Amino acid sequence: MPLLFLERFPWPSLQTYTALSALLLAGTVLSAYSTVRDSEFSSALSEGPQNEELKLENLGNVATGVLLHLITDSLFVWVMVNTACCILMLIGKVIQCIVFGPLRVSEKQHLKDKFWNFIFYKFIFIFGVLNVQRVEEVVLWCLWFSMLIFLHLMVQLCKDRFEYLSFSPTTPMSSHVRVLALLVSVLSCCGGLAVLCALAGHIHGMHTVAFMAAECLLVTVRTGHVIIRYSIHLWDLNHEGTWENKSSYIYYTDFIMELAILSLDLMHHIHMLLFGNIWLSMASLVIFMQLRHLFHEVQRRIRRHKNYLRVIDNMESRFAVATPEELAANNDDCAICWDSMTTARKLPCGHLFHNSCLRSWLEQDTSCPTCRMSLNIHEGRREREEGQREPLEDNMAAAGAADARAHINQHNHFFHFDGSRIASWLPSFSVEVMHTTNILGIAQANNSQLNGMAHQIQEMFPQVPYHLILQDLQLTRSVEVTTDNILEGRIQVPFPTQSTDRTPIQMNAASEDGAGASSGSEVAAPEAEDFEVRGSRFSKSADERQRMLMQRKEELLLRARRRYLHKKPEDGDAYSVLGADNDDSVPSIEDEDSDSVTLRRRRLAAAAERRILRQEPSPF
């Protein structure tokens, strides 16, 4: 939190800071000169007149006295420290203009984060670990850490710029030369700081030398790391053809250097913890948290290296090197890096990839990059759990069995808190919230694969709706199992709608038998007709949707005609009320058991008619 406050504080610009520092230094020098001159003037009056040589000697003594006064005074010495910091900032600005030019947003953010973390942590080190009481020692440590932070920022800036330039093959060589020359200069400055550490060992003791040497070694190793990476990149640029072993050199360079930096930092913090009696202080908590973070980083790096070795072993044992005939027959570029292939490895699906590209891919996924076919690289449960926690490093876990239970389809929400962005001693932790959409724990295949299998089954069973086949495939993920379910009746197929003729139904209204025969033929007609399966309501095909709409329209017209014809009276005394239900069956009104409600209504209507006729008077 204090770092956030410092970052949001309205700091002055470099021009304003330089002007204020110059004014402050001038005022301090004038004040010190007036003090020294008064003392020298009083001594000169007591000694009498002097010649020119003595006057020049007195001027030299005055300059020396002013400098000593600035260094020894408890207030003026901080002005000198501020002046040194201002000079370093101006040197850094000049280096930026000559070597880097305008900085990118990410580079500025990295510099800001590293600067404030370094300031906060070294403040804890000076006043919490060393427990410095004298002003002179505080000044010396401030000057020492000012030089260190300057070198750290230069190395960080060179690293960010190298990562940016390495992605562009058209970068001019002059840009690389400038950055590499700056790295060599930083490395030589680290050698000079090592000499200062050796000189300080005779005065301040071995513990102080160990602290200074650890900080100096950290800068040296980081600088050497960037120089080696830069050398590999420049060699690859000037090397003709594809350098297959480049990724291996880069990986082992990163692994050795990062492990060396973490080990040095870990021993440095252990030394700080054991140096002072700080077991019950705030500084001890800070160091303990930093030790925990470094220890977990070492574990994570070693675990990642084991995963790398496991990937190499699986790749070399399972996937053979492609022969020249296969490369000539394929005649294609690598699908990962889009570069031509002189050597490649062949997957079981037949696709070819560079050795380094395939290794990088298998560290993240265990399927073919082109067709997404599972490679079935089986590992233990422990590796699977590690792969869920670190998907970019340890996800070479099992792809699952080929039957039906490979993975669980989950929607994950990953939240990560990086404490090092706020302060280097803050911990980093991650929270992953998962919910499973498949209760049975069966993975859902790719949509394209499911659609292909569903169309294949529908060609064999056209009477089964497409959506029912797709629902069963989402559970079984197997064409054979879904086919068995259809044959054994486990999939409930709805009764299909028959295709109807557009010609109106001709009914014989003269005789009751003719009507019965026509209705009977209508009921029996669907048995002789071919069935047409109605597609899904939300079909993707426009033709299928249009056909479904016309079919539904014809059904509604047919039912309306039937209702109209069956409600029309056929004889003078009797009415035939025929209803069309969902099965298109025509019930007979002569059967009393068919519809008791209709018969009761007819009887009531006949009785009411007779009553009305009796009440009417006779005309004669």
From Swiss-Prot:
Low complexity bias spans:
510-526
Q: What is its main location?
A: endoplasmic reticulum
Q: Where is the composition biased (Acidic residues)?
A: 581-595
Provide the Gene Ontology terms for cellular component. cytosol; endoplasmic reticulum; endoplasmic reticulum membrane; ubiquitin ligase complex
List the InterPro entries.
AMFR_Ube2g2-bd (IPR040675), CUE (IPR003892), Znf_RING (IPR001841), Znf_RING/FYVE/PHD (IPR013083)
Coiled-coil stretches noted in the UniProt entry, renumbered to this chain: none
UniProt pathway: Protein modification; protein ubiquitination
Write out the tissue specificity statement of the associated record.
Answer: Widely expressed.
Q: Where is this chain compositionally biased, Basic and acidic residues type?
A: 531-544
Its GO biological process annotations read:
endoplasmic reticulum unfolded protein response; protein K48-linked ubiquitination; protein polyubiquitination; response to endoplasmic reticulum stress; ubiquitin-dependent protein catabolic process
Which keywords has UniProt assigned to this entry? Endoplasmic reticulum, Membrane, Metal-binding, Transferase, Transmembrane, Transmembrane helix, Zinc, Zinc-finger
Please state what is observed when this gene is inactivated.
Answer: Knockdown embryos are small and display dysregulation of lipid homeostasis. They show increased lipid content, and increased cholesterol synthesis. They demonstrate impaired touch-evoked escape responses associated with decreased axonal branching.
SUPFAM superfamilies in the cross-refs: RING/U-box (SSF57850)
- Outline the residue ranges of the record's RING-type zinc fingers: 334-372
What EC class is this? transferase
Instruction: Give the membrane topology, semicolon-separated if more than one.
Output: Multi-pass membrane protein
Residue ranges annotated for the CUE domain, each copy included? 449-491
* EC number(s) stated in the UniProt entry for this protein: 2.3.2.36
Task: Provide the protein name.
Answer: E3 ubiquitin-protein ligase AMFR
